[in-house]
């Protein structure tokens, strides 16, 4: 792939509770008093994945949309790194079928669902024989499991059993929370 220049991770999932919100029934999923904004609920998957892969960004910019009750329902977070830019796109009130993408100078990696990948593709620029598909396509080896929480549970149990308070995952989580806090602090209501 050569030098990575851009990453765009997206998780836009229409909430099953949104129709009830539109009918005037405000459930916990759309109650701003509970602090469960979309960035904290589903944007975290994009942001955490970017932090795990690329580290803490040097600059963060964000924009959010709100519902009538000031619930932050969707947004975009731009994250600046020394040689690349990343974006986290998230929504609880729309749906998207676009894959998440890591773009390098010689190709791209496409990830079907950032929250629970089931297919990861490498598409290279060089040697293109099929311009419609953007070049050579290779399916990368990946074996999803039925319950994607199994990895988290195994790691969590290991941390508890080994008193792993200072584990590397802690720093990823702290960096992710700092970014989310920045987004929430800069959130202005856009209806």
Language-model segments: which ranges?
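Short polybasic amphipathic segments
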Residues: 100, 117-131
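Contiguous beta-strand/loop segments that form the cofactor/metal-binding neighborhood of enzyme cores
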Residues: 44-118, 153-164
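Short glycine/proline- and acidic residue-enriched helix-loop micro-motifs
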Residues: 29-34, 133-141
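Short, glycine/charged-enriched secondary-structure capping and boundary segments
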Residues: 20-25, 75-76, 117, 124
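Active-site loop of classical SDR/Rossmann-like NAD(P)-dependent oxidoreductases
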Residues: 140-154
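C-terminal helix-rich "cap/oligomerization" subdomain common to oxidoreductases
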Residues: 154-191
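A generic structural signal for residues located within well-ordered alpha-helices
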Residues: 42-45, 151, 172-175
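Predominantly a Rossmann-like dinucleotide-binding segment in NAD(P)-dependent oxidoreductases
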Residues: 1-58, 190
């Amino acid at each position: 792939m050569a030098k990575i220049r851009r990453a765009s991770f997206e998780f836009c999932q229409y909430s099953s509770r949104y129709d009830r919100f539109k009918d005037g029934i405000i459930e916990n999923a759309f109650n701003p008093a509970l602090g469960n904004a979309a960035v904290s609920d589903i944007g975290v998957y994009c942001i955490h994945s970017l932090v795990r892969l690329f580290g803490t960004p040097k600059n963060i910019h964000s924009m959010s949309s709100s519902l009538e009750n000031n619930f932050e329902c969707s947004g975009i977070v731009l994250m600046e790194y020394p040689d690349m830019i990343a974006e986290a796109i998230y929504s609880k009130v729309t749906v998207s079928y676009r894959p998440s993408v890591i773009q390098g100078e010689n190709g791209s990696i496409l990830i079907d669902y950032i929250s629970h990948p089931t297919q990861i593709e490498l598409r290279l620029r060089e040697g293109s024989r099929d311009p419609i598909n953007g070049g050579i396509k290779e399916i990368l080896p990946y074996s999803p499991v039925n319950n994607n929480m199994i990895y988290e549970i195994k790691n969590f149990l290991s941390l508890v059993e080994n008193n792993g308070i200072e584990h590397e995952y802690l720093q990823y989580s702290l960096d992710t929370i700092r970014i989310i806090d920045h987004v929430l602090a800069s959130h202005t209501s856009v209806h």
